């Protein structure tokens, strides 16, 4: 509880203690510096959407499935089916900590005094001893799954942050990570109390060179008392949240004049 309370305190310019930023806050900054500033400085958060309970359940079931092979030291069928027979789920005493949302893999970025953390889905290891970051994704669409859409840059940045965090902890990490991307089929006759999925293993070659410059920009932003510019929406155009706040404020002020 103490950890959560400290983490929820607003940033104070010039503070000496490290300021915790999650992987999702880095993504928030990349999307909209203003939303990030409001969150970090004033604890004004974006409204949250509904929980993705089915996606979370799929994540947990995948973890159980891969953990069986982790304990046995054997590759999962999705590995062998994709030519990764020498790859196995990685065993480490801190794996459960790395997976836990409120701890994750952590690293202090000393130049900015930002304490970065992020909860991974899974880690594999190849024959060279390199760790492989793995992220589970779930969806339902008629077309096949990919990571090629513009908005999926967030998926790629997510993986790169995890790769960077593990490297900051002294691990040798492969540039190539994998998305275990499962797609609920809609071409079946009915529901029948079950969903059928088709799963695809998608490789991605990460590059974490953007992370440390971004952390420097984040630190400069929260040190500044002025709100930064509005960012971009995932599908293009100004940030949806900032646009809503602007229009609602304008309408409210107009109403108060009456």
Question: Where on the chain are the PLM-derived regions?
Answer:
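Short catalytic/ligand-binding loop motif for oxyanion handling, primarily in non-cytosolic enzymes
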Residues: 37-38, 45-47, 141-145, 185-189, ...
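Mg2+/Mn2+-dependent nuclease catalytic core
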Residues: 98-213
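A residue-level signal for conserved active-site and pocket-lining positions in enzyme catalytic cores
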Residues: 32, 66, 162, 211, ...
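Residue-level detector of secondary-structure boundary/capping sites
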Residues: 56-57, 153, 233
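Metal-dependent nuclease catalytic regions and adjoining charged, substrate-binding loops involved
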Residues: 1-5, 11-16, 20-21, 165-258
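Metal-dependent nuclease catalytic cores that hydrolyze phosphodiester bonds in DNA/RNA
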Residues: 1-126, 130, 258
